[in-house]
């Protein structure tokens, strides 16, 4: 923990609960809720860290290997959902858009964005109901052994209609 006013760092000893992320890149701070949220997209598990009790509120441990290494994920404050795109797992890149609802009992939505090649290590930002996705590494087939490449392109995805638009693309080696 970084204390900005004192310019010092501190550690919090976790006393209990389940951290549901099975790998370190499945954690997000949600400023609108002042919460640290651990997530597991394969199993649709979530756990909130309570800094006062120093415990994770999750009770179920993850058991599956996941398919979303180095995905991009944003919090959507309009409906309290998590919006994820892409990732890597089991020797495949993916182009799945996942919309998850950690604060309510709503099924996770899986949408294949076939207009975008499968990839991981993308960047994204949410502006109103539009998700912008930039770059990444992957390949058209999604199979890691078939000539992966870096992407330098920008897409917009309307979260209501799932309409995908390619806004621009730079050369492969800018």
Predicted regions and their residues:
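Beta-propeller fold detector
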Residues: 5, 10-15, 50, 57-63, ...
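Beta-strand-rich domains and repeat architectures in extracellular enzymes and scaffolds
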Residues: 1, 14-33
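Hydrophobic/aromatic beta-strand positions that recur at structurally equivalent sites within the blades
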Residues: 1-4, 29, 39, 48-51, ...
